[in-house]
Design a protein with these regions (language model features):
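Conserved small/polar residues in nucleotide/adenosyl-binding loops
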Residues: 1-5
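Flexible loop/turn connectors
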Residues: 146-198
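Short beta-strand elements in bilobed, periplasmic/extracellular small-molecule ligand-binding domains
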Residues: 31-32, 80-96
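Hinge/beta->alpha junction and helix N-cap segments in small-molecule ligand-binding domains
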Residues: 36-43, 63-73, 90-99, 119, ...
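An alpha-beta-alpha
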Residues: 34-81, 179, 183-199
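Periplasmic-binding protein-like
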Residues: 9-11, 59-62, 91, 110-122, ...
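Hydrophobic alpha-helical segments within soluble ligand-binding/sensing domains
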Residues: 16-56, 157-178
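Short beta-strand elements of ligand-binding domains
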Residues: 6-19, 35-36, 138-144
Length: 217
């Protein structure tokens, strides 16, 4: 068991309230825990889908049901997409073993696929791409790494910048400038719309000029 007096800073934890089972989370964990979140604005991710695919009717949301952060993201994005007029369906899978079957089911029933920031999906982007790309179903991802593996676009944060922010928080704690018990979770301030040039070309998609190509090397 960790020592409660030692400050603990998390880095890139998507949703602290969900991860730590905090009811009514207000942005500050309290105690000896704080850190940074890699949560992109989910309403803007939904808006991105509408911007790119306004004529689509159905969106399938694929995620690992074992990851609480993923459940939070898909529930939120689903609600936002439904406000925009889409018909949405959640497609959870328990682990990598049934990722292919669930992805195939989602692909068969959806015009567009959305995948959140999800560790299991990130480890299985090849499976998602091998099913969705041949079927001509575009995937919009919650973060750049997944978009690089199987997506057409994402609203990306800089994990480097987020790490720098975490480091600055640590420095403030060590020098006594800040008390971790009252230090709110820090979020990324800048988001960049990015696209996967390889998959977009394969699907015949031309994205708006403000989208930046993902480095595929």
């Amino acid at each position: 068991m960790y020592k409660r007096q030692i400050p603990i800073l998390g880095t890139s934890i998507t949703e602290y309230g969900v991860a730590l089972n905090i009811q009514g989370f207000d942005g500050t964990v309290g105690g000896n825990v704080s850190g940074t979140s890699d949560l992109a604005p989910l309403d803007q991710q939904a808006a991105m889908i509408y911007e790119l695919f306004p004529d689509a009717e159905t969106v399938g949301l694929i995620y690992c049901s074992a990851e609480a952060n993923s459940q939070y993201q898909v529930d939120t994005v689903k609600a936002e997409l439904e406000k925009l007029g889409y018909t949405c369906e959640l497609y959870p899978f328990a682990d990598s073993n049934d990722a292919a079957a669930v992805t195939q089911t989602a692909c068969d029933a959806s015009d567009v696929i959305y995948v959140p920031t999800d560790n299991t999906v990130a480890s299985n982007t090849g499976i998602v791409d091998n099913i969705c790309q041949p079927a001509g179903v575009p995937v919009v991802a919650g973060e750049e790494g997944i978009a690089k593996g199987c997506g057409v676009a994402t609203l990306s944060i800089s994990y480097y910048d987020l790490g720098v922010t975490t480091g600055k928080m640590a420095a403030q704690i060590l020098t006594g400038e800040a008390d971790i018990s009252s230090m709110p979770i820090a979020y990324a301030e800048n988001f960049t719309p990015k696209y996967n040039p390889v998959i977009c070309e394969a699907l015949g998609l031309t994205l708006p000029e403000n989208y930046v190509a993902i480095d595929m090397e």
